[in-house]
Amino acid sequence: MEGEQLQTAPYNPRFPQQNQTKHCWANYVDYYGCVKHYNGDNSKCQTFFNSMNSLCPAAWISEWDEQKAADLFPSDRV
């Protein structure tokens, strides 16, 4: 990780508690919803992507990606 700059997601008043599970979920759904809205152009969705990768464990993202691929993900926004 040498030379890689780590950043955490900025404060979001919708999620004031320390438990950031819902914040992680919201950024995952918001990122893929944004990409869907812009027809695959993820350059406009970078804020959601950075927050998602900062807050969510890689195992969760991987699991949700598998659910999306199998059309089992529990949100119609992605």
Swiss-Prot record:
Compartments, record wording: Mitochondrion inner membrane
Membrane in keyword set: yes
A GO CC term attached to the entry: respiratory chain complex IV
Major location (coarse): mitochondrion
Signal peptide: none
Family the entry assigns: Belongs to the cytochrome c oxidase subunit 6B family.
Subunit structure: Component of the cytochrome c oxidase (complex IV, CIV), a multisubunit enzyme composed of a catalytic core of 3 subunits and several supernumerary subunits. The complex exists as a monomer or a dimer and forms supercomplexes (SCs) in the inner mitochondrial membrane with ubiquinol-cytochrome c oxidoreductase (cytochrome b-c1 complex, complex III, CIII).
Protein name per the record: Probable cytochrome c oxidase subunit 6B
Organism: Dictyostelium discoideum (Social amoeba)
Lineage: Eukaryota, Amoebozoa, Evosea, Eumycetozoa, Dictyostelia
